[in-house]
Structure formats: structure tokens, C-alpha cells
Amino acid sequence: MYKRQRQNRKAKAHLAVDTGMTRIGFQVTEHDADEAAKIADLPHIELEGMFTHFSCADQEDKTYCSMQMEKYDKMTALLAERGVTIPLRHICNSAGIMEFDDHRFEMVRSGIITYGIYPSEEVKKERLDLIPALSWKSHVIHVKEVGPGIGVSYGATYVTEKPMTRIATVSAGYADGYPRALSNQGCVLIHGKKAPIIGRICMDQMMVDVTDIPDVQVEDVVTLVGTDGDETITICLLYTSPSPRDSTSS
């Protein structure tokens, strides 16, 4: 701020308004509108925008969102009464972009949908056709065939039962961010088919059953996240958290 003053330039600022997130921002009151107007009158501040944040836009019940929009509109009116015009108004996050046509205003803030992922299962997906932008691939580094009764990986938590099991070792593990919780539960894609993970996932390797996938060889591409043929594994399926945001921002 002081540097801008010395340069005789204005610092652009966006006013935060608390409409129900109870995180940051001015309250929607006459007093706080007065304070915001004082900021707008400062010689080296240009009040370029005003924003708030939806707390429940990705839920089916939009009652709370309606209350937030009403508060935001009221703050806009309170500032207008004080001669303050806001050029850039923004309230819509990813779910808001999909749900509220009348409150997109001059700017929106796309988050999770930038990754091609829906904010939740409760938004109206038909309004926006999203394609996941994330993919994660590795390679087969070893292939072997074993008989029945053979333990796989740490603790031998998986023991082969078939007369012959073909096992491919994949160069990826929990040190790369792959969830170890998917040991003996998850799958990868090879040649457009699902290959179940067998045994515990190691630090930088995992074993998968490719008995039913013909011609798997070393250096074959393994899809951990993404699409191969008609099969898809999304980042949401990979992680056990109910929110896709944990995986896209970690």
C-alpha cells in the first residue's frame, strides 16, 4: 500500500463480504457498509471487486444459498446508496456456476470443475458436460507366472488360488501418492481392461493380476487414473475421501 502511494498508483482491491460462510469479510450491516465506503474513498485504493463464498452450493437444498445471495445483493445496494459502484462482482464457485445463472455477474471462480470433476453428486450434471482432465500412468516392469498357494507382497495378505496366476509388477506405490488403502481392493487399467491389485501396495511398486489380460509385457502402459478403451478410473474413485477436493489439491 505504501509503495503504491509513493508511486502515485492505486492498489486494486476486492471486498470480502460474509454472507454465511463465517470465515472472512464484512458483515452485511449499515455500519460495515459505512466502513467499506471509507475504504473505497481512500486515494490509493481502487475497489475493483466484491466477493462472497457459497457454503452449500453443492448440496441439493439451495435454501442457504438463497439467503447468501440475498445478503450479497443487499450489500451491493448498501454500497450503491453510499455512491460505491462495484465493477467486478463474484459469488459463484464451481457449484454456483452450474446452479445459479442469475448470480454469475461479471466474474466467477471455477475450482474443482477446472479439473473436469463435478463438485458433488447433488449438482445438476446435465447443465455442464465435464471431461476429467487428470490422468496418471505408469508401466509394467516385470511379469511372472506362479502356481497356487503363493503369497504376494508384504504380509502375504494375498495368496494365489488359481492353477496359474499371471502377475504384473507396476512401477507405482504409496510413495508416489497411490493410496495404500487400495491394497487387495483397487484396480488399474492395462490394454483397456481392469487388472485387480493383489497384495499390499509397496513404496514404489504394486502387483496386479493380469491372468485374464492377454499379452501383457514389460513396458506396457498402466493407467492408474484416466481412460483406457471403454474403462475409466477417476481420481474420485482412487481416493477414499468423500470430497474430490482432497485429491485434486493435495
Identify the function of each model-found stretch:
Residues 133-184:
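Functionally critical, mid-to-C-terminal surface segments that flank or help form catalytic/ligand
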Residues 1-5, 239-244:
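Conserved small/polar residues in nucleotide/adenosyl-binding loops
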Residues 173-175, 193, 200, 224-228:
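Short, surface-exposed secondary-structure boundary micro-motifs
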Residues 6-12, 18-139, 143-147:
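Active-site loop/helix belt of alpha/beta enzymes
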Residues 229-238:
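Short, Lys/Arg- and Gly-enriched loop/turn segments at beta-strand edges
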Residues 181-182, 189, 216:
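Short, well-ordered loop/turn sites that connect or cap secondary structure elements
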